[in-house]
Structures are given as C-alpha cells and as structure tokens.
C-alpha cells in the first residue's frame, strides 16, 4: 500500500508543473490516493472479521475523496450490536492503522448514539453528509442507510441552513483579519475551500442533490457555475 501511495505522490510531483497550469487534474490524483486507502482499509477490516458486526465509514475529507498527503484519515465505525462487548479484533484494526503511520481520527458508535449526537450537534450532523461506507455486511449497510435517511428527515432544512450561515459569519470574523488578509488560510478564509464545502453541504441537505454539478435552478449564471465547478475540482 505504501509503495502505491509513493508512486502516486511521485507521479503528482512529476506532473506538478502541468497541474499548476491546469489544476483540475489534481482531482484525479486525489481520487487515486483515496482508492488505495479504501482498498487497504476495507481488506484489513474484512480480514479481521469485523464486517459481520461493524460498518466501516469514511467521513470528512476522506469521505469526500479529497485525501491529500497530509490529510487525516477520519473514520466512523458503526456498531450494529452495541450491547455486546467490543471485539478485540476492533482494537487490533485500530492498532494496525497506527502502525501504518496514518494520522487517524476515529469514533466507534451505535446507530442510536450517532443519531442522538447528530440531532444535538449540527457540526456532527454535517460530517454525516460526507459519509461513505467502506466495508460491512450487505444487511447491515442496508439497515444503516435506512437509519441515516430517517435522521436526515428529522433535521429541518431551514435550521441547517441558518446554522451554516451563522457558522460562515463567525468564520469570516475569525479569518478576515489583517493577518489573514496578508497570508490567507486557503481552507478557512472567506472565499476558500470551506465555502465550497458549505455550498456542497447546503445543496445536499436543502436541495437534496449530492453534487453541485447537478445544480439546475438558475442560482448561478453560466460563468459563475463554471468557476464554482472548477474550484470544486481544484480543491483550491
């Protein structure tokens, strides 16, 4: 796996001059990195015999398939039988991740705990909009998708929109100082990556579409839409 990642990163560095002129190609590179990690984690998860009880999910940038070399690997593991004692193999799986020198952020939750946390914390709920299932039994995944759909119905669109709007205002106040104007934070500053994510999250929740590419409501003119799609592919 590490050899595959090294080859992808080497390819990226070799193509860097080309990518600087046409940065949309970065998207292909990020997808390659994500697929390598997907395959390795899914394989190890299944080999550890965890798929019958647990569901392995990617969230955050990993869930969005935006896995940069320095990105954390954010995981949520759904326990479909939380009344039982956690399996030792689950600890072994987490230890294996650390042994690979990955920067891992993970949580292990039951579906009911996940729903409760998400209803009370819209930041946590937002992370579920980028969730991507990596491994688990077909039966458990079907049940999980059903539970996730039920959760989405309980979160009101207007409440979510207002939350993201207020969140953006607070972020602008924090990252729009003279210091950040001189050296912008390309993730959090106004007009940067987090704004694109916010557009995507609002589209997913309020317009019920899974990609800004599917926007067909005359919200943006042709030029604005082209710019937005290019920024989304470039990932800033």
What is each residue range found by the language model?
Residues 1-52, 70, 176-177:
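N-terminal regions immediately upstream of nucleotidyltransferase
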Residues 26, 110-210, 220-222:
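Active-site phosphate/pyrophosphate-binding segments
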Residues 31, 35, 70, 87, ...:
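Conserved structured core elements
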Residues 34-38, 42, 48, 86-139:
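Conserved catalytic core of two-metal-ion nucleotidyltransferases
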Residues 37-87:
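Active-site nucleotide-donor binding segment shared across nucleotidyl transfer reactions
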Residues 56, 70-76, 210-222:
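Short, conserved phosphate-binding/catalytic loop or strand-edge motifs used
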Residues 74-77, 90-98, 197-200, 229-232:
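Short, well-ordered alpha-helical packing segments
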Residues 234-236:
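Conserved small/polar residues in nucleotide/adenosyl-binding loops
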């Amino acid at each position: 796996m590490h050899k595959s990642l090294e080859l992808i990163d080497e390819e990226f560095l070799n193509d860097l001059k080309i990518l600087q002129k046409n940065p949309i190609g970065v998207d292909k590179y990020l997808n390659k990195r994500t697929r390598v990690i997907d395959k390795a984690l899914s394989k190890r998860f299944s080999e550890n015999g965890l798929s019958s009880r647990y569901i392995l999910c990617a969230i955050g940038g990993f869930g969005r398939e935006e896995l940069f070399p320095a990105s954390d690997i954010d995981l949520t593991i759904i326990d479909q039988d939380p009344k039982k004692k956690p399996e030792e193999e689950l600890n072994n799986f987490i230890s294996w991740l650390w042994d690979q020198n990955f920067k891992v952020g993970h949580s292990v939750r039951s579906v009911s705990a996940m729903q409760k946390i998400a209803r009370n914390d819209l930041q946590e709920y937002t992370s579920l909009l980028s969730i991507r299932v990596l491994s688990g039994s077909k039966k458990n995944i079907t049940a999980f998708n059903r539970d996730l759909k039920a959760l989405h119905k309980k979160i009101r669109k207007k409440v979510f929109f207002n939350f993201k709007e207020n969140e953006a205002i607070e972020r602008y106040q924090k990252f729009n100082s003279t210091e950040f104007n001189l050296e912008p934070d390309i993730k959090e500053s106004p007009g940067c990556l987090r704004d694109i994510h916010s557009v995507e999250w609002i589209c997913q929740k309020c317009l019920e579409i899974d990609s800004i590419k599917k926007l067909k409501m005359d919200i943006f003119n042709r030029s604005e839409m082209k710019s937005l799609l290019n920024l989304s592919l470039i990932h800033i």
